[in-house]
Amino acid sequence: MRTLDLADPTSWRAWSGGHSFDMSFIDPYRSHGDPNAHLCRTLDNISPGDIQGGSLTYNTVAHQWLWVGQSIGGAYFLLSPDLIDWTPGGLFFPAQVTWDFQCGDKDPIEYPSLIDPTSTSRNFDTVGNTAYLYFTQFHSCLEDTLDRDLVRVPISITK
């Protein structure tokens, strides 16, 4: 969603599914229009379709947005110049994930995220040519325990 004025509810615009944020919202209690025709659309061109969670940072080496998420097989990355069009997912870090885990498999991971401790941005939302991949690794056959580790793996990014 986008707006130029946070205080003005009528100025908010949502993604319409095209190439811009041009969908206006309506008040379902005061308007006679169909509220379903004014919903924010999803980005259906992100692949693989089952990639989940993760982190979104701007990579200062590739000059693109870098999304790291998880899917069967491990942690994946996608790149985008504009947050609309995305590259196909590439395997970033092979690992077992929780939703296809069975006892006896390698310990699964969740929540992959990139953080560059040298980032000068306020929220560490930029990544340069080196960063760390953080993730949670679960133990004990995914029983309801707190037996898990926060793991940090150094990475290098080249153009």
Give the ranges of each region predicted by the language model.
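Beta-rich carbohydrate-recognition and catalytic domains
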Residues: 1-53, 58-104, 119-159
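Short hydrophobic/aromatic beta-strand or adjacent loop that forms the aromatic wall/cage
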Residues: 109-111
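Hydrophobic, well-ordered secondary-structure elements that form the walls
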Residues: 114
